[in-house]
C-alpha cells in the first residue's frame, strides 16, 4: 500500500468520453485504445489510482452516446498496467454478490493486488428499466447494499459461506483463490444521506465525497470519524473529487473556466442530471453552473496556477483527505500539465 503520509493523486477514467456536459467533443473518445494509453501514461507521470465508473448509459454526453463497461475494462487494464490502483465502481442491483466476488478476486490476481471497489447504490431509474434491474426507494437501496457487502465479505474471508437474507441466498459457497489483498480489497463508498453515512462507517474502508471546499470536507471527515468510532472500528481513509486544470496566469484560468461553464440547458446530459438530482439526497443545492462539470468538481477549487493549486492541495491534506479523485478535459493533455505543475513539485 502507498505511504499514508502523502496525499495520493487519482483520476476518473474517462469511460464516458469526457466530463463536461456543455462541451460536445472533448477530444477523448470512450474507447479501449484511449483509456489503455491513458492508464499506462498516468503511471509514468505520478498518478496513483484510477476510478472507473459503472454506468450502462452515458450520463454526461446523453444516453445515446458510447460508454465503456467498467468491469471488462478494469480486467483489461489490470493486465497492461504495473502500479496503478484500480478503484472500480459496482452497483449491487446489477451484480449477484457471490458471482461478483469470484470475478473481482480474479481481477485482483491479474493486477497482483491492485483492485479496490467503489460501491454505489443505484440512482438512475431509466437505466435500471432499460437493463432489467431492480430500482428501489432510496433507503431500501442501502438495505440491499448492506446485505450485498455481507455476502461479499463472507465469501472472500471464509472457507465456506452460507447466507439467507432478504435479498440474497447462498449455500456453502466456496471461493478460491481468495483475493490477493487480505482480508479483502479496499472498499470505498460515498453518500450524503444518514442511511448512506451509517452504512459506510460500519462496513467500508474509505469514504469518498463529491467536490467541496476543504472546510466543508473537514467537517464531513470529522463526522465520519465520529460515526466510525461509535462502531468501534479502525481508521477510515477519505477521498474527494475535483475538476482540475492549471494555467500560468489567472487570466488564462478565467478564460478556461468560462469555456467549460458556458451553460446549455438543452445539452444531452441535462436530462440525466435532473434524474440524478431526483434520485439522490444532497446536503447542499447545486447551481446550474456547477451542473456543467461532473460530480460538483468545481467546488474543490483545484483550478488555478500551480502555486494556487499546491496551496489548495495542502488545505485538503489538513482537512484529513488521503486521496484526490480528479477529472480533466482533454484528459491526457491536462493530466500531463497538472503532473508537471503540481504532482512533480511536491
Give residue spans per PLM region.
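N-terminal beta1-alpha1-beta2 module of alpha/beta enzyme domains
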Residues: 1-80, 180-185
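Acidic (Asp/Glu)-rich catalytic clusters
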Residues: 2-4, 43-44, 74-83, 104, ...
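An alpha-helical appendage that flanks or caps ligand/catalytic pockets
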Residues: 2-5, 11-15, 44, 131, ...
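Conserved, mostly hydrophobic/aromatic
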Residues: 9, 42, 46, 77, ...
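Hydrophobic faces of well-ordered beta-strands that scaffold small-molecule active sites
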Residues: 9-11, 50-52, 86-90, 115-119, ...
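Active-site mouth loops of central-metabolism enzymes
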Residues: 18-33, 89-98, 134, 181-192, ...
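Catalytic domains of carbohydrate-active enzymes, especially glycoside hydrolases
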Residues: 33-53, 199-210, 315-321
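Alpha-helix-loop-beta-strand connector modules within alpha/beta enzyme cores
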Residues: 61-87, 144-148, 230, 336-346
Amino acid at each position: 500500500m502507498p505511504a499514508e503520509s502523502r496525499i495520493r493523486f487519482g483520476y476518473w477514467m474517462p469511460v464516458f468520453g469526457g466530463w463536461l456536459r456543455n462541451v460536445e467533443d472533448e477530444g477523448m473518445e470512450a474507447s479501449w485504445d484511449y483509456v489503455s494509453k491513458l492508464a499506462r501514461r498516468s503511471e509514468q507521470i505520478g498518478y496513483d489510482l484510477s476510478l472507473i465508473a459503472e454506468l450502462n448509459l452515458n450520463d454526461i454526453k446523453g444516453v445515446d452516446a458510447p460508454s465503456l463497461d467498467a468491469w471488462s475494462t478494469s480486467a483489461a487494464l489490470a493486465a497492461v498496467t504495473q502500479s496503478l490502483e484500480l478503484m472500480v465502481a459496482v452497483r449491487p442491483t446489477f451484480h449477484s454478490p457471490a458471482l461478483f466476488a469470484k470475478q473481482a478476486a480474479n481481477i485482483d490476481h491479474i493486477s497482483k493486488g491492485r483492485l479496490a471497489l467503489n460501491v454505489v447504490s443505484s440512482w438512475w431509474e431509466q437505466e435500471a428499466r432499460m437493463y432489467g434491474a431492480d430500482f428501489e426507494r432510496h433507503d431500501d437501496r442501502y438495505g440491499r447494499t448492506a446485505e450485498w457487502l455481507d455476502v461479499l465479505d463472507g465469501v472472500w474471508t471464509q472457507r465456506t459461506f452460507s447466507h439467507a437474507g432478504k435479498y440474497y441466498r447462498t449455500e456453502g459457497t466456496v471461493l478460491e483463490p481468495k483475493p490477493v489483498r487480505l482480508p479483502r480489497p479496499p472498499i470505498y463508498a460515498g453518500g450524503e444521506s444518514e442511511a448512506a453515512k451509517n452504512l459506510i462507517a460500519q462496513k467500508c474502508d474509505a469514504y469518498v465525497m463529491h467536490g467541496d471546499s476543504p472546510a466543508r470536507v473537514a467537517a464531513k471527515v470529522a463526522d465520519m470519524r465520529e460515526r466510525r468510532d461509535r462502531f468501534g472500528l479502525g481508521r477510515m481513509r477519505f477521498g474527494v473529487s475535483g475538476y482540475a486544470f492549471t494555467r500560468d496566469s489567472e487570466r488564462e484560468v478565467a478564460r478556461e473556466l468560462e469555456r467549460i461553464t458556458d451553460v446549455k440547458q438543452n445539452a444531452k446530459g441535462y436530462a440525466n442530471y435532473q434524474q440524478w438530482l431526483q434520485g439522490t439526497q444532497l446536503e447542499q443545492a447545486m447551481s446550474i453552473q456547477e451542473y456543467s462539470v461532473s460530480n460538483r468538481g468545481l467546488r474543490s477549487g483545484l483550478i488555478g496556477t500551480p502555486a494556487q493549486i499546491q496551496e489548495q492541495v495542502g488545505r485538503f491534506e489538513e482537512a484529513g483527505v488521503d486521496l484526490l479523485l480528479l477529472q480533466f478535459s482533454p484528459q491526457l493533455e491536462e493530466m500531463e500539465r497538472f503532473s508537471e505543475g503540481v504532482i512533480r513539485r511536491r
